[in-house]
Protein backbone atom coordinates (compact mmCIF):
# COMPACT_ATOMS: atom_id res chain seq x y z
CA UNK A 1 0.00 0.00 0.00
CA UNK A 2 1.32 3.41 -0.88
CA UNK A 3 1.93 6.36 1.37
CA UNK A 4 -0.81 8.88 0.52
CA UNK A 5 -2.32 11.99 2.11
CA UNK A 6 -4.58 11.42 5.08
CA UNK A 7 -7.73 12.47 3.18
CA UNK A 8 -7.16 9.88 0.49
CA UNK A 9 -6.25 7.31 3.11
CA UNK A 10 -9.68 7.89 4.65
CA UNK A 11 -11.35 7.43 1.26
CA UNK A 12 -9.40 4.21 0.77
CA UNK A 13 -10.32 3.14 4.29
CA UNK A 14 -14.04 3.50 3.54
CA UNK A 15 -13.71 1.91 0.13
CA UNK A 16 -12.01 -1.17 1.52
CA UNK A 17 -14.65 -1.51 4.22
CA UNK A 18 -17.44 -1.26 1.63
CA UNK A 19 -15.63 -3.74 -0.60
CA UNK A 20 -15.22 -6.24 2.22
CA UNK A 21 -18.93 -6.04 2.99
CA UNK A 22 -19.78 -6.49 -0.67
CA UNK A 23 -17.44 -9.45 -0.98
CA UNK A 24 -19.00 -11.13 2.05
CA UNK A 25 -22.51 -10.60 0.67
CA UNK A 26 -21.50 -12.10 -2.68
CA UNK A 27 -20.18 -15.21 -0.96
CA UNK A 28 -23.34 -15.57 1.12
CA UNK A 29 -25.51 -15.22 -1.98
CA UNK A 30 -23.39 -17.77 -3.81
CA UNK A 31 -22.41 -15.45 -6.63
CA UNK A 32 -19.94 -17.15 -8.96
CA UNK A 33 -16.83 -15.68 -10.46
CA UNK A 34 -16.82 -15.81 -14.24
CA UNK A 35 -13.85 -15.59 -16.53
CA UNK A 36 -13.15 -11.99 -17.46
CA UNK A 37 -12.49 -11.17 -21.12
CA UNK A 38 -9.48 -8.98 -21.89
CA UNK A 39 -11.45 -6.41 -23.84
CA UNK A 40 -9.88 -3.34 -25.44
CA UNK A 41 -11.56 -0.13 -26.54
CA UNK A 42 -10.99 1.18 -30.06
CA UNK A 43 -12.34 4.57 -29.01
CA UNK A 44 -9.41 5.02 -26.63
CA UNK A 45 -6.76 4.47 -29.33
CA UNK A 46 -5.30 7.94 -29.96
CA UNK A 47 -3.24 6.85 -32.99
CA UNK A 48 -6.02 4.86 -34.61
CA UNK A 49 -3.84 2.18 -36.19
CA UNK A 50 -1.91 1.02 -33.11
CA UNK A 51 -2.07 -2.65 -32.23
CA UNK A 52 -3.95 -2.78 -28.94
CA UNK A 53 -2.93 -5.48 -26.48
CA UNK A 54 -4.74 -6.29 -23.24
CA UNK A 55 -3.21 -5.80 -19.82
CA UNK A 56 -4.08 -8.97 -17.97
CA UNK A 57 -5.91 -9.53 -14.70
CA UNK A 58 -3.14 -9.48 -12.09
CA UNK A 59 -1.39 -6.73 -14.08
CA UNK A 60 -4.50 -4.58 -13.59
CA UNK A 61 -4.49 -4.90 -9.77
CA UNK A 62 -3.92 -1.52 -8.11
CA UNK A 63 -0.94 -2.77 -6.13
CA UNK A 64 0.77 -3.66 -9.44
CA UNK A 65 -0.50 -1.03 -11.88
CA UNK A 66 0.60 1.92 -9.72
CA UNK A 67 4.21 0.73 -9.48
CA UNK A 68 7.26 1.45 -11.63
CA UNK A 69 10.10 -1.06 -11.43
CA UNK A 70 13.81 -0.60 -12.12
CA UNK A 71 16.68 -3.06 -12.46
CA UNK A 72 20.24 -1.77 -12.76
CA UNK A 73 23.18 -4.05 -13.59
CA UNK A 74 26.84 -3.38 -12.93
CA UNK A 75 29.52 -4.73 -15.26
CA UNK A 76 33.27 -4.56 -14.67
CA UNK A 77 33.89 -4.04 -18.38
CA UNK A 78 33.14 -1.23 -20.81
CA UNK A 79 30.13 -2.41 -22.81
CA UNK A 80 29.18 -1.04 -26.20
CA UNK A 81 26.09 1.05 -25.39
CA UNK A 82 25.08 1.39 -29.04
CA UNK A 83 25.32 -2.37 -29.55
CA UNK A 84 23.10 -3.04 -26.52
CA UNK A 85 20.56 -0.53 -27.83
CA UNK A 86 20.59 -2.05 -31.33
CA UNK A 87 20.18 -5.52 -29.86
CA UNK A 88 17.13 -4.40 -27.91
CA UNK A 89 15.57 -2.86 -31.03
CA UNK A 90 16.28 -6.07 -32.94
CA UNK A 91 14.56 -8.13 -30.22
CA UNK A 92 11.42 -6.03 -30.63
CA UNK A 93 11.25 -7.06 -34.29
CA UNK A 94 10.78 -10.71 -33.34
CA UNK A 95 7.05 -11.61 -33.44
CA UNK A 96 5.32 -10.91 -30.14
CA UNK A 97 8.24 -9.09 -28.55
CA UNK A 98 7.06 -5.76 -29.95
CA UNK A 99 4.87 -5.67 -26.83
CA UNK A 100 7.91 -4.18 -25.08
CA UNK A 101 7.69 -1.17 -27.39
CA UNK A 102 4.09 -0.39 -26.54
CA UNK A 103 2.57 2.58 -24.77
CA UNK A 104 0.55 2.14 -21.60
CA UNK A 105 -2.93 3.62 -21.81
CA UNK A 106 -5.74 4.04 -19.31
CA UNK A 107 -9.16 3.89 -20.96
CA UNK A 108 -12.15 5.97 -19.94
CA UNK A 109 -13.32 3.20 -17.62
CA UNK A 110 -9.88 2.97 -15.98
CA UNK A 111 -8.77 -0.26 -17.63
CA UNK A 112 -5.17 -0.41 -18.80
CA UNK A 113 -4.13 -1.34 -22.34
CA UNK A 114 -0.87 -1.53 -24.26
CA UNK A 115 -0.85 0.36 -27.57
CA UNK A 116 1.92 -0.82 -29.90
CA UNK A 117 2.77 1.35 -32.93
CA UNK A 118 2.48 -0.54 -36.23
CA UNK A 119 5.79 1.04 -37.17
CA UNK A 120 8.30 2.82 -34.96
CA UNK A 121 9.96 6.13 -35.82
CA UNK A 122 12.10 8.89 -34.31
CA UNK A 123 8.94 10.53 -33.00
CA UNK A 124 7.55 7.21 -31.71
CA UNK A 125 10.61 5.13 -30.76
CA UNK A 126 10.54 1.57 -29.46
CA UNK A 127 12.54 2.42 -26.34
CA UNK A 128 13.48 5.55 -24.40
CA UNK A 129 17.27 5.34 -24.72
CA UNK A 130 19.83 7.48 -22.91
CA UNK A 131 23.60 7.20 -22.52
CA UNK A 132 25.81 9.05 -20.05
CA UNK A 133 29.49 9.01 -21.01
CA UNK A 134 31.86 9.06 -18.03
CA UNK A 135 34.52 7.11 -19.91
CA UNK A 136 37.28 9.39 -18.65
CA UNK A 137 36.51 8.47 -15.02
CA UNK A 138 36.96 5.17 -13.20
CA UNK A 139 34.14 4.01 -10.95
CA UNK A 140 36.35 4.23 -7.86
CA UNK A 141 37.10 7.90 -8.63
CA UNK A 142 33.51 8.97 -9.21
CA UNK A 143 31.83 10.69 -6.27
CA UNK A 144 28.64 8.61 -6.35
CA UNK A 145 29.71 5.48 -8.21
CA UNK A 146 32.48 4.89 -5.69
CA UNK A 147 29.74 4.28 -3.10
CA UNK A 148 28.08 1.47 -5.08
CA UNK A 149 27.51 -1.70 -3.03
CA UNK A 150 30.36 -4.18 -3.22
CA UNK A 151 31.21 -7.47 -1.49
CA UNK A 152 33.11 -7.22 1.78
CA UNK A 153 34.76 -10.63 1.64
CA UNK A 154 33.62 -13.06 4.34
CA UNK A 155 32.32 -10.25 6.56
CA UNK A 156 28.59 -9.36 6.36
CA UNK A 157 27.78 -5.70 5.94
CA UNK A 158 25.05 -3.08 5.50
CA UNK A 159 25.51 -0.73 2.55
CA UNK A 160 23.79 2.12 0.73
CA UNK A 161 20.34 1.40 -0.73
CA UNK A 162 19.02 1.64 -4.28
CA UNK A 163 17.50 5.09 -4.13
CA UNK A 164 20.86 6.78 -3.59
CA UNK A 165 21.84 5.65 -7.10
CA UNK A 166 18.76 6.77 -8.98
CA UNK A 167 20.84 8.82 -11.45
CA UNK A 168 22.45 5.58 -12.67
CA UNK A 169 19.10 3.81 -12.97
CA UNK A 170 17.10 6.10 -15.24
CA UNK A 171 17.28 9.44 -17.07
CA UNK A 172 16.56 12.57 -15.06
CA UNK A 173 13.58 13.48 -17.25
CA UNK A 174 11.71 10.24 -16.52
CA UNK A 175 9.12 10.96 -13.78
CA UNK A 176 8.50 8.43 -11.04
CA UNK A 177 4.74 8.87 -11.43
CA UNK A 178 2.84 6.09 -13.20
CA UNK A 179 0.43 8.60 -14.74
CA UNK A 180 3.31 9.79 -16.91
CA UNK A 181 2.94 6.55 -18.88
CA UNK A 182 -0.83 6.80 -19.12
CA UNK A 183 -0.99 10.37 -20.36
CA UNK A 184 2.03 10.65 -22.66
CA UNK A 185 2.99 8.84 -25.84
CA UNK A 186 6.17 7.49 -24.24
CA UNK A 187 7.59 3.97 -24.54
CA UNK A 188 7.08 1.76 -21.51
CA UNK A 189 10.69 0.63 -21.58
CA UNK A 190 13.59 2.92 -20.66
CA UNK A 191 17.22 1.86 -21.26
CA UNK A 192 19.74 4.07 -19.43
CA UNK A 193 23.46 3.28 -19.76
CA UNK A 194 26.32 4.93 -17.87
CA UNK A 195 29.81 4.22 -19.20
CA UNK A 196 32.93 4.53 -17.02
CA UNK A 197 36.57 3.95 -17.87
CA UNK A 198 36.46 0.53 -16.18
CA UNK A 199 32.83 -0.47 -16.02
CA UNK A 200 29.25 0.01 -17.16
CA UNK A 201 25.89 0.45 -15.46
CA UNK A 202 22.81 -0.64 -17.40
CA UNK A 203 19.41 0.47 -16.08
CA UNK A 204 16.01 -0.82 -17.22
CA UNK A 205 12.81 0.89 -16.08
CA UNK A 206 9.18 0.05 -16.91
CA UNK A 207 5.71 -0.08 -15.34
CA UNK A 208 5.32 -3.11 -13.09
CA UNK A 209 2.13 -3.99 -14.98
CA UNK A 210 4.33 -5.10 -17.90
CA UNK A 211 5.81 -8.12 -16.13
CA UNK A 212 7.19 -9.61 -12.91
CA UNK A 213 10.71 -10.73 -11.99
CA UNK A 214 10.56 -14.08 -13.79
CA UNK A 215 9.21 -12.41 -16.91
CA UNK A 216 11.99 -9.84 -16.69
CA UNK A 217 14.52 -12.66 -16.50
CA UNK A 218 13.15 -14.18 -19.71
CA UNK A 219 13.30 -10.77 -21.38
CA UNK A 220 16.95 -10.36 -20.35
CA UNK A 221 17.81 -13.81 -21.70
CA UNK A 222 16.19 -12.98 -25.03
CA UNK A 223 17.97 -9.62 -25.25
CA UNK A 224 21.38 -11.08 -24.36
CA UNK A 225 20.91 -13.84 -26.94
CA UNK A 226 20.23 -11.26 -29.64
CA UNK A 227 23.30 -9.22 -28.64
CA UNK A 228 25.38 -12.42 -28.77
CA UNK A 229 24.12 -13.18 -32.29
CA UNK A 230 21.89 -16.03 -31.12
CA UNK A 231 18.46 -14.73 -32.11
CA UNK A 232 17.38 -18.28 -32.95
CA UNK A 233 17.54 -19.06 -29.22
CA UNK A 234 14.85 -16.51 -28.39
CA UNK A 235 11.76 -18.27 -27.09
CA UNK A 236 8.34 -17.40 -28.51
CA UNK A 237 6.36 -14.87 -26.50
CA UNK A 238 3.07 -16.28 -25.23
CA UNK A 239 -0.07 -14.65 -23.85
CA UNK A 240 0.10 -11.31 -25.63
CA UNK A 241 -3.57 -11.45 -26.64
CA UNK A 242 -5.07 -13.85 -24.10
CA UNK A 243 -4.39 -14.06 -20.37
CA UNK A 244 -2.91 -17.47 -19.58
CA UNK A 245 -4.74 -17.19 -16.22
CA UNK A 246 -8.02 -16.28 -17.93
CA UNK A 247 -9.97 -19.22 -16.48
CA UNK A 248 -7.84 -19.96 -13.41
CA UNK A 249 -9.79 -19.34 -10.23
CA UNK A 250 -13.09 -18.76 -12.03
CA UNK A 251 -16.27 -20.83 -11.99
CA UNK A 252 -14.86 -22.65 -15.03
CA UNK A 253 -11.99 -23.95 -12.90
CA UNK A 254 -13.33 -27.02 -11.09
CA UNK A 255 -10.19 -27.45 -8.98
CA UNK A 256 -10.67 -23.94 -7.62
CA UNK A 257 -14.37 -24.20 -6.90
CA UNK A 258 -14.57 -27.68 -5.37
CA UNK A 259 -12.89 -26.91 -2.07
CA UNK A 260 -11.44 -24.23 0.16
CA UNK A 261 -8.06 -22.58 0.16
CA UNK A 262 -5.92 -23.55 3.15
CA UNK A 263 -6.41 -20.14 4.84
CA UNK A 264 -9.81 -19.32 3.35
CA UNK A 265 -11.57 -18.85 6.68
CA UNK A 266 -8.79 -16.56 7.93
CA UNK A 267 -9.36 -13.75 5.42
CA UNK A 268 -9.32 -10.32 7.03
CA UNK A 269 -12.84 -8.90 6.97
CA UNK A 270 -15.24 -6.52 8.68
CA UNK A 271 -14.01 -4.96 11.92
CA UNK A 272 -10.66 -6.77 11.69
CA UNK A 273 -10.05 -5.24 8.25
CA UNK A 274 -11.07 -1.78 9.45
CA UNK A 275 -8.80 -2.09 12.47
CA UNK A 276 -5.91 -3.37 10.39
CA UNK A 277 -6.20 -0.49 7.89
CA UNK A 278 -6.52 2.12 10.64
CA UNK A 279 -3.40 0.81 12.38
CA UNK A 280 -1.49 0.75 9.12
CA UNK A 281 -2.55 4.29 8.22
CA UNK A 282 -1.50 5.51 11.65
CA UNK A 283 1.86 3.78 11.32
CA UNK A 284 2.46 5.36 7.89
CA UNK A 285 1.46 8.78 9.19
CA UNK A 286 3.49 8.74 12.40
CA UNK A 287 6.50 6.52 11.64
CA UNK A 288 8.27 7.79 8.56
CA UNK A 289 11.84 6.79 9.39
CA UNK A 290 11.98 4.08 6.73
CA UNK A 291 15.45 3.57 5.28
CA UNK A 292 16.38 1.52 2.21
CA UNK A 293 19.71 -0.29 2.40
CA UNK A 294 21.49 -3.33 1.03
CA UNK A 295 22.59 -6.26 3.18
CA UNK A 296 25.55 -8.36 2.08
CA UNK A 297 25.39 -11.90 3.51
CA UNK A 298 28.54 -13.84 2.55
CA UNK A 299 28.57 -17.61 2.19
CA UNK A 300 30.39 -17.89 5.52
CA UNK A 301 27.58 -16.09 7.33
CA UNK A 302 24.93 -18.14 5.53
CA UNK A 303 26.70 -21.31 6.67
CA UNK A 304 26.72 -19.97 10.24
CA UNK A 305 23.01 -19.14 10.03
CA UNK A 306 22.09 -22.53 8.60
CA UNK A 307 24.14 -24.43 11.18
CA UNK A 308 22.34 -22.72 14.06
CA UNK A 309 18.90 -23.26 12.53
CA UNK A 310 19.48 -26.91 11.66
CA UNK A 311 20.87 -27.72 15.10
CA UNK A 312 17.74 -26.30 16.72
CA UNK A 313 15.41 -28.07 14.28
CA UNK A 314 17.24 -31.35 14.87
CA UNK A 315 16.71 -31.06 18.63
CA UNK A 316 13.03 -30.23 18.18
CA UNK A 317 12.31 -32.98 15.63
CA UNK A 318 13.81 -36.08 17.20
CA UNK A 319 17.12 -35.93 15.39
CA UNK A 320 15.58 -35.29 11.98
CA UNK A 321 16.42 -32.03 10.19
CA UNK A 322 13.47 -30.78 8.10
CA UNK A 323 14.33 -29.05 4.84
CA UNK A 324 14.45 -25.26 4.80
CA UNK A 325 15.78 -23.29 1.83
CA UNK A 326 18.20 -20.37 1.88
CA UNK A 327 15.21 -18.17 1.10
CA UNK A 328 13.41 -19.50 4.18
CA UNK A 329 16.48 -18.79 6.30
CA UNK A 330 16.94 -15.21 5.09
CA UNK A 331 13.24 -14.38 5.31
CA UNK A 332 12.96 -15.87 8.81
CA UNK A 333 16.13 -14.08 9.93
CA UNK A 334 14.84 -10.76 8.58
CA UNK A 335 11.37 -11.28 10.06
CA UNK A 336 12.91 -12.05 13.45
CA UNK A 337 14.83 -8.75 13.29
CA UNK A 338 11.66 -6.84 12.36
CA UNK A 339 9.51 -8.48 15.02
CA UNK A 340 12.13 -7.74 17.67
CA UNK A 341 11.80 -4.00 16.99
CA UNK A 342 10.09 -1.89 19.63
CA UNK A 343 7.20 -0.92 17.33
CA UNK A 344 6.29 -4.60 17.00
CA UNK A 345 5.76 -5.37 20.65
CA UNK A 346 2.45 -6.98 21.66
CA UNK A 347 1.00 -7.67 18.21
CA UNK A 348 0.49 -10.65 15.93
CA UNK A 349 2.24 -10.95 12.58
CA UNK A 350 1.88 -12.28 9.06
CA UNK A 351 4.77 -12.96 6.71
CA UNK A 352 3.86 -12.69 3.02
CA UNK A 353 6.16 -14.53 0.63
CA UNK A 354 5.54 -13.76 -3.04
CA UNK A 355 5.62 -16.91 -5.20
CA UNK A 356 5.60 -17.51 -8.94
CA UNK A 357 2.74 -19.42 -10.57
CA UNK A 358 4.80 -20.62 -13.54
CA UNK A 359 5.34 -24.34 -13.21
CA UNK A 360 2.84 -24.70 -10.35
CA UNK A 361 -0.37 -24.78 -12.39
CA UNK A 362 -0.71 -28.06 -14.28
CA UNK A 363 -1.74 -27.88 -17.94
CA UNK A 364 -1.87 -24.08 -17.98
CA UNK A 365 1.39 -22.84 -19.51
CA UNK A 366 2.81 -23.67 -22.93
CA UNK A 367 5.92 -25.82 -22.70
CA UNK A 368 8.99 -23.65 -23.23
CA UNK A 369 6.87 -20.53 -23.59
CA UNK A 370 7.77 -17.09 -22.26
CA UNK A 371 5.12 -14.94 -20.57
CA UNK A 372 5.61 -11.21 -20.03
CA UNK A 373 3.01 -10.58 -17.35
CA UNK A 374 2.64 -10.75 -13.58
CA UNK A 375 2.05 -14.32 -12.43
CA UNK A 376 2.49 -13.90 -8.69
CA UNK A 377 0.52 -14.52 -5.50
CA UNK A 378 1.41 -14.48 -1.78
CA UNK A 379 2.05 -17.47 0.47
CA UNK A 380 1.14 -16.38 3.99
CA UNK A 381 2.59 -17.47 7.32
CA UNK A 382 0.42 -16.45 10.28
CA UNK A 383 1.95 -15.90 13.73
CA UNK A 384 -0.03 -15.31 16.91
CA UNK A 385 0.95 -12.55 19.31
CA UNK A 386 2.85 -15.06 21.43
CA UNK A 387 4.62 -16.61 18.43
CA UNK A 388 5.61 -13.21 17.05
CA UNK A 389 7.19 -12.36 20.40
CA UNK A 390 9.02 -15.62 21.06
CA UNK A 391 9.53 -17.60 17.83
CA UNK A 392 13.15 -18.24 16.89
CA UNK A 393 14.60 -17.93 13.41
CA UNK A 394 14.49 -21.73 13.12
CA UNK A 395 10.80 -21.92 14.08
CA UNK A 396 9.88 -19.11 11.68
CA UNK A 397 11.86 -20.73 8.84
CA UNK A 398 10.06 -24.04 9.36
CA UNK A 399 6.71 -22.21 9.39
CA UNK A 400 7.58 -20.47 6.12
CA UNK A 401 8.48 -23.78 4.48
CA UNK A 402 5.25 -25.35 5.75
CA UNK A 403 3.19 -22.47 4.31
CA UNK A 404 4.86 -22.81 0.92
CA UNK A 405 4.21 -26.56 0.82
CA UNK A 406 0.59 -26.21 1.95
CA UNK A 407 -0.43 -23.20 -0.15
CA UNK A 408 1.40 -23.31 -3.47
CA UNK A 409 0.60 -26.61 -5.19
CA UNK A 410 -1.66 -26.72 -8.26
CA UNK A 411 -5.00 -26.99 -6.46
CA UNK A 412 -4.23 -24.57 -3.62
CA UNK A 413 -2.80 -21.99 -6.05
CA UNK A 414 -6.03 -22.11 -8.06
CA UNK A 415 -8.14 -21.65 -4.93
CA UNK A 416 -5.95 -18.76 -3.83
CA UNK A 417 -6.42 -17.26 -7.30
CA UNK A 418 -10.19 -17.52 -6.81
CA UNK A 419 -9.88 -15.47 -3.63
CA UNK A 420 -7.41 -13.10 -5.29
CA UNK A 421 -9.92 -12.33 -8.04
CA UNK A 422 -12.34 -11.02 -5.43
CA UNK A 423 -9.68 -9.01 -3.62
CA UNK A 424 -8.19 -7.56 -6.80
CA UNK A 425 -11.59 -6.63 -8.20
CA UNK A 426 -12.97 -5.08 -5.03
CA UNK A 427 -9.90 -3.70 -3.28
CA UNK A 428 -7.02 -3.81 -5.73
CA UNK A 429 -4.78 -5.59 -3.24
CA UNK A 430 -3.36 -9.04 -2.63
CA UNK A 431 -5.53 -11.24 -0.37
CA UNK A 432 -4.87 -10.59 3.29
CA UNK A 433 -4.96 -13.28 5.98
CA UNK A 434 -4.29 -11.29 9.13
CA UNK A 435 -5.79 -10.43 12.49
CA UNK A 436 -6.90 -6.96 13.51
CA UNK A 437 -3.63 -6.32 15.36
CA UNK A 438 -1.30 -7.92 12.81
CA UNK A 439 1.72 -6.31 11.29
CA UNK A 440 3.01 -7.52 7.94
CA UNK A 441 6.49 -8.57 6.88
CA UNK A 442 6.77 -8.92 3.11
CA UNK A 443 9.43 -10.77 1.15
CA UNK A 444 10.07 -11.44 -2.51
CA UNK A 445 12.85 -13.81 -3.52
CA UNK A 446 14.41 -13.33 -6.96
CA UNK A 447 16.94 -16.15 -6.66
CA UNK A 448 15.18 -18.34 -9.23
CA UNK A 449 15.18 -15.48 -11.75
CA UNK A 450 19.00 -15.84 -11.93
CA UNK A 451 19.41 -12.26 -13.10
CA UNK A 452 23.21 -12.41 -13.17
CA UNK A 453 22.99 -15.25 -15.69
CA UNK A 454 20.10 -13.75 -17.64
CA UNK A 455 21.85 -10.39 -18.15
CA UNK A 456 25.10 -12.00 -19.34
CA UNK A 457 25.76 -10.31 -22.70
CA UNK A 458 29.07 -12.10 -23.18
CA UNK A 459 32.29 -10.77 -24.71
CA UNK A 460 30.46 -9.75 -27.89
CA UNK A 461 29.00 -6.77 -26.01
CA UNK A 462 32.37 -5.29 -25.04
CA UNK A 463 33.91 -2.35 -26.87
CA UNK A 464 36.63 -3.88 -29.03
CA UNK A 465 40.15 -2.94 -27.94
CA UNK A 466 38.93 -0.80 -25.06
CA UNK A 467 41.68 0.09 -22.59
CA UNK A 468 39.23 -0.31 -19.73
CA UNK A 469 38.42 -3.87 -20.83
CA UNK A 470 42.10 -4.83 -20.98
CA UNK A 471 42.53 -3.50 -17.44
CA UNK A 472 39.41 -5.37 -16.28
CA UNK A 473 40.86 -8.58 -17.70
CA UNK A 474 44.09 -8.09 -15.74
CA UNK A 475 42.10 -7.33 -12.59
CA UNK A 476 40.11 -10.57 -12.97
CA UNK A 477 43.27 -12.65 -13.31
CA UNK A 478 44.76 -11.11 -10.17
CA UNK A 479 41.50 -11.57 -8.25
CA UNK A 480 41.55 -15.32 -8.87
CA UNK A 481 44.56 -15.53 -6.57
CA UNK A 482 43.61 -12.94 -3.95
CA UNK A 483 39.83 -13.13 -3.42
CA UNK A 484 38.68 -16.75 -3.11
CA UNK A 485 35.46 -15.67 -1.34
CA UNK A 486 34.30 -13.65 -4.36
CA UNK A 487 32.76 -15.08 -7.52
CA UNK A 488 34.92 -14.40 -10.58
CA UNK A 489 32.91 -13.31 -13.60
CA UNK A 490 33.34 -13.79 -17.31
CA UNK A 491 33.52 -10.78 -19.65
CA UNK A 492 30.10 -9.25 -20.26
CA UNK A 493 28.52 -10.84 -17.18
CA UNK A 494 27.22 -8.53 -14.43
CA UNK A 495 28.95 -8.61 -11.06
CA UNK A 496 25.95 -7.22 -9.21
CA UNK A 497 22.52 -5.69 -9.76
CA UNK A 498 19.85 -3.93 -7.80
CA UNK A 499 16.10 -3.64 -8.21
CA UNK A 500 13.45 -1.44 -6.67
CA UNK A 501 10.13 0.29 -7.19
CA UNK A 502 10.27 3.97 -8.08
CA UNK A 503 6.68 5.22 -7.81
CA UNK A 504 6.36 8.57 -6.07
CA UNK A 505 3.58 7.15 -3.86
CA UNK A 506 5.38 3.92 -3.04
CA UNK A 507 6.85 3.54 0.43
CA UNK A 508 7.20 -0.10 1.47
CA UNK A 509 8.06 -0.93 5.05
CA UNK A 510 9.18 -4.12 6.77
CA UNK A 511 9.98 -5.49 3.32
CA UNK A 512 12.85 -7.62 2.03
CA UNK A 513 13.92 -8.32 -1.55
CA UNK A 514 16.33 -11.23 -1.91
CA UNK A 515 18.37 -10.64 -5.06
CA UNK A 516 19.91 -14.10 -5.06
CA UNK A 517 23.43 -15.47 -4.70
CA UNK A 518 26.62 -15.49 -6.73
CA UNK A 519 28.53 -18.60 -7.74
CA UNK A 520 30.23 -18.98 -4.36
CA UNK A 521 27.08 -18.52 -2.28
CA UNK A 522 27.20 -14.84 -1.27
CA UNK A 523 23.73 -13.25 -1.02
CA UNK A 524 22.53 -9.69 -1.53
CA UNK A 525 19.30 -8.46 0.07
CA UNK A 526 17.59 -5.09 -0.27
CA UNK A 527 15.32 -4.00 2.58
CA UNK A 528 12.94 -1.20 3.56
CA UNK A 529 13.13 -1.00 7.34
CA UNK A 530 12.80 1.31 10.32
CA UNK A 531 15.85 2.77 12.00
CA UNK A 532 15.45 0.56 15.08
CA UNK A 533 15.37 -2.56 12.89
CA UNK A 534 18.51 -1.49 11.06
CA UNK A 535 20.21 -1.02 14.43
CA UNK A 536 19.29 -4.57 15.47
CA UNK A 537 20.61 -5.98 12.20
CA UNK A 538 23.86 -4.07 12.57
CA UNK A 539 24.34 -5.49 16.08
CA UNK A 540 23.60 -8.99 14.79
CA UNK A 541 26.16 -8.70 12.01
CA UNK A 542 28.74 -7.14 14.34
CA UNK A 543 28.44 -10.12 16.70
CA UNK A 544 29.51 -12.45 13.87
CA UNK A 545 32.81 -10.66 13.23
Swiss-Prot record:
<keyword id="KW-0808">Transferase</keyword>
<dbReference type="GO" id="GO:0016746">
    <property type="term" value="F:acyltransferase activity"/>
</dbReference>
<dbReference type="InterPro" id="IPR051283">
    <property type="entry name" value="Sec_Metabolite_Acyltrans"/>
</dbReference>
<feature type="signal peptide">
    <location>
        <begin position="1"/>
        <end position="19"/>
    </location>
</feature>
<feature type="glycosylation site" description="N-linked (GlcNAc...) asparagine">
    <location>
        <position position="445"/>
    </location>
</feature>
<comment type="similarity">
    <text>Belongs to the plant acyltransferase family.</text>
</comment>
<feature type="glycosylation site" description="N-linked (GlcNAc...) asparagine">
    <location>
        <position position="70"/>
    </location>
</feature>
<feature type="glycosylation site" description="N-linked (GlcNAc...) asparagine">
    <location>
        <position position="346"/>
    </location>
</feature>
<feature type="active site" description="Proton acceptor">
    <location>
        <position position="208"/>
    </location>
</feature>
<comment type="pathway">
    <text>Secondary metabolite biosynthesis.</text>
</comment>
<keyword id="KW-0325">Glycoprotein</keyword>
<keyword id="KW-0012">Acyltransferase</keyword>
<dbReference type="Pfam" id="PF02458">
    <property type="entry name" value="Transferase"/>
</dbReference>
<keyword id="KW-0843">Virulence</keyword>
<dbReference type="InterPro" id="IPR023213">
    <property type="entry name" value="CAT-like_dom_sf"/>
</dbReference>
<feature type="glycosylation site" description="N-linked (GlcNAc...) asparagine">
    <location>
        <position position="198"/>
    </location>
</feature>
<comment type="function">
    <text>Acetyltransferase; part of the gene cluster that mediates the biosynthesis of botrydial. Botrydial is necessary for colonization of plant tissue by the T4 strain. It is a strain-dependent virulence factor since highly aggressive strains like SAS56 or B05 still retain substantial virulence when botrydial synthesis is impaired, since they produce also botcinic acid. The first step of botrydial biosynthesis is performed by the sesquiterpene synthase BOT2 which catalyzes the cyclization of farnesyl diphosphate (FPP) to presilphiperfolan-8-beta-ol (PSP).</text>
</comment>
<feature type="region of interest" description="Disordered">
    <location>
        <begin position="466"/>
        <end position="493"/>
    </location>
</feature>
<keyword id="KW-0732">Signal</keyword>
<protein>
    <recommendedName>
        <fullName>Acetyltransferase BOT5</fullName>
        <ecNumber>2.3.1.-</ecNumber>
    </recommendedName>
</protein>
Amino acid sequence: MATIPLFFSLILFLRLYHASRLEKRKEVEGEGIVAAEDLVSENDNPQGDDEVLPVHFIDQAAIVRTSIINYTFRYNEVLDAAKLHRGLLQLLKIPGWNKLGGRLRATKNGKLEIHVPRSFSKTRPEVKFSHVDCSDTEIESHGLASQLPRPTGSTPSIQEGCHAFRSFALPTDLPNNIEHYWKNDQPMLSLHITSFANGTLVGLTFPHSLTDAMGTSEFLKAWSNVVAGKSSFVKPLQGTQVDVLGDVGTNLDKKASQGEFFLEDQQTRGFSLLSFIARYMWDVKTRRSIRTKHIYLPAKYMSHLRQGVEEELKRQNGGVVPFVSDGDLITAWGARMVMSSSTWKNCSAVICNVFDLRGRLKGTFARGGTYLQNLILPATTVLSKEEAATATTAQIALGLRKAIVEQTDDVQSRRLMRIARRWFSSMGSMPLFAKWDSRVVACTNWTKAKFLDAADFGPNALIAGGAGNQKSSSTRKAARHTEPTQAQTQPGRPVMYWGTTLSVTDNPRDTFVIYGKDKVGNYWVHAYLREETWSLIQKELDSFR
